[in-house]
């Protein structure tokens, strides 16, 4: 391992931040990336970069939808949610956040220079404030409202 490699130093620093903050999500994610980077699996980084976000969103969606699929959250409970103001507000906010995420994807594609800042900010938010790493898309969406998509 070449400790003068800036990329490795950044990853090690982020892993340390995850460990210090007791955030297993950051720690495991960074350690997996380090393993990929330091082994012959490094050849799969283009695939991980291209498909990782999609796979992550699929897994996140499975986790969110599991209570409905398992029956823990009954159909009647779901239907009754349309009658409560908090649930209706949650629906509106869900639509807004999804829209922001879409803007975020566009911004990250059209202005790749902002990606590093968004990623570092998200990792810091996860590590220091016990957030969850869904932030880059939403952060990019919010940023797109301020700076535009192009």
Curated annotation (Swiss-Prot):
Highest taxon, organism lineage: Bacteria
- A GO CC term attached to the entry: plasma membrane
Cellular localisation:
Cell membrane
Q: Which family does it belong to?
A: Belongs to the UPF0756 family.
Q: Please indicate if the UniProt record lists Plastid as a keyword.
A: no
Give the transmembrane ranges: 16-36, 53-73, 82-102, 114-134
Give the protein's recorded name.
UPF0756 membrane protein SG1722
The answer, when asked if Transcription regulation is one of the entry's keywords, is no
Keywords assigned = Cell membrane, Membrane, Transmembrane, Transmembrane helix
Membrane topology recorded in Swiss-Prot or TrEMBL:
Multi-pass membrane protein
List, alphabetically, the InterPro entries matched.
UPF0756_TM
């Amino acid at each position: 391992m070449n400790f003068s490699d800036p990329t490795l130093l950044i990853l090690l620093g982020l892993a340390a931040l995850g460990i210090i903050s007791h955030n297993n999500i950051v720690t495991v994610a960074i350690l997996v990336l380090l393993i990929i980077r330091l082994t012959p699996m490094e050849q799969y980084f283009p695939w991980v970069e291209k498909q990782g976000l999609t796979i992550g969103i699929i897994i996140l969606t499975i986790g969110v939808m599991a209570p409905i699929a398992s029956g823990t959250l009954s159909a009647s409970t779901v239907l009754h949610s349309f009658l409560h103001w908090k649930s209706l507000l949650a629906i509106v906010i869900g639509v807004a956040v999804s829209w922001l995420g879409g803007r975020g994807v566009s911004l990250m594609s059209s202005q790749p220079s902002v990606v590093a800042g968004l990623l570092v900010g998200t990792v810091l938010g996860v590590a220091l404030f016990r957030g969850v790493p869904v932030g880059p898309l939403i952060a990019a969406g919010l940023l797109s409202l301020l700076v535009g998509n192009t």
